[in-house]
């Protein structure tokens, strides 16, 4: 038979109130904490988080819903967040919705049934009705990377518009004018922001935006391959291309190799994220680097502030845009 809190109380000689306070994160004297932890180990006691959640309305679990678990950007953020949340006694349930709106809705519904204390979401669905339903529980939501109209919640974003603007300006300052872009899905917030930055940089330099130099991809490796091939085929005058996420950057490099294009002699390129991949390329790839560590820390901090400082909540929504950085390689040629 499994050990109970009463068994721990008998073993330690402490009252049930003290034992309960320990398990619910309350203040317990150090000598009592040691007694309780020794008894837990001796009795092989396991906390029934679901049962405790029914009593306290807190399960000390956080739901995380992301579009692609094998996406480097997502994976690095999850790792950083989990480390911080775990250090505060919270576990995470990670749901990979595979960039599928239906799977995302199902994931949020599943997490709601599991009575998670909050949800961290990098959203795919731009309507967010499933998130609105979760908000009715009174529990917090923190959005990463993308905002949803009509959802009043905290968000930690990257300044994607400026990221793209900086990358395109980097080309322009080195003499490039025929600059292509491999963008993301047109309906995705980050893709819209990056496309807006691309257009703004060109317009600020007096360079007309040409539709033939724009490829709307799908944030996949294969999308990067197709985008590179289409842009090169349709734009023989193109001297540079900006690829707007890591997976498509990998795909674009595959496309370059398959077509026998020399970087940067025949085509200059700026990619997105993953410094290790950029360093492995020959020549080393110039990239836009997103602050994944900073995003992870901010998201965890905002969520923990909701869960652990409820009495101090100001009622104001938190929204922050973090800056990206261009890490120069040798993939951009200076034109005479």
Residue ranges of predicted features:
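N-terminal helix-turn-helix DNA-binding module of bacterial transcription factors
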Residues: 1-60, 336
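Short gly/ser/thr-rich secondary-structure transition/capping motifs
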Residues: 42-48, 102, 122-124, 253
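Hinge/beta->alpha junction and helix N-cap segments in small-molecule ligand-binding domains
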Residues: 66-76, 94-103, 146, 156-166, ...
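Short acidic capping loops at alpha-helix termini that bridge into adjacent secondary structure
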Residues: 177-178, 209-213, 262-268
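Alpha-helical recognition/docking segments in bacterial nutrient-uptake
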Residues: 3-4, 34, 53, 57-173, ...
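Flexible loop/turn connectors
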Residues: 229-336
């Amino acid at each position: 038979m499994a050990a109970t809190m009463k068994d721990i109380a008998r073993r330690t000689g402490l009252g049930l109130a003290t034992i309960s306070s320990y398990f619910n994160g309350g203040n317990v004297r150090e000598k009592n904490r040691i007694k309780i932890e020794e008894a837990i180990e001796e009795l092989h006691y396991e906390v029934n988080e679901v049962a405790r959640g029914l009593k306290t309305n807190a399960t000390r679990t956080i739901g995380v819903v992301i579009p692609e678990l094998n996406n480097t950007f997502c994976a690095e953020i999850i790792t950083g967040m989990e480390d911080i949340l775990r250090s505060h006694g919270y576990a995470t349930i990670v749901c990979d919705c595979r960039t599928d709106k239906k799977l995302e809705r199902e994931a949020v519904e599943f997490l709601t049934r599991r009575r998670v204390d909050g949800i961290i979401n990098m959203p795919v669905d731009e309507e967010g009705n499933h998130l609105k339903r979760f908000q009715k529980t009174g529990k917090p939501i923190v959005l990463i990377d993308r905002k949803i109209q009509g959802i009043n919640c905290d968000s930690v974003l990257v300044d994607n518009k400026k990221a793209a603007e900086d990358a395109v300006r980097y080309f322009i300052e080195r003499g490039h004018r025929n600059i292509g872009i491999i963008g993301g899905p047109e309906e995705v917030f980050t893709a819209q922001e990056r496309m807006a930055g691309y257009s703004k940089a060109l317009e600020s330099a007096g360079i007309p935006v040409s539709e033939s130099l724009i490829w709307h991809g799908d944030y996949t490796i294969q999308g990067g391959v197709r985008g590179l091939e289409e842009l090169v085929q349709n734009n023989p005058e193109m001297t540079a291309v900006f690829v707007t996420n890591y997976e498509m950057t990998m795909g674009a490099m595959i496309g370059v190799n398959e077509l026998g294009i020399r970087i940067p002699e025949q085509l200059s390129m700026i990619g997105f994220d993953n410094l290790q991949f950029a360093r492995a390329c020959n020549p080393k790839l110039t990239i836009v680097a997103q602050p994944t560590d900073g995003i992870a820390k901010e998201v965890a901090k905002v969520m923990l502030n909701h869960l652990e400082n409820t009495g101090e909540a100001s009622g104001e929504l938190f929204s922050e845009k973090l800056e990206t950085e261009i890490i120069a390689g040798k993939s951009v040629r200076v034109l005479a």
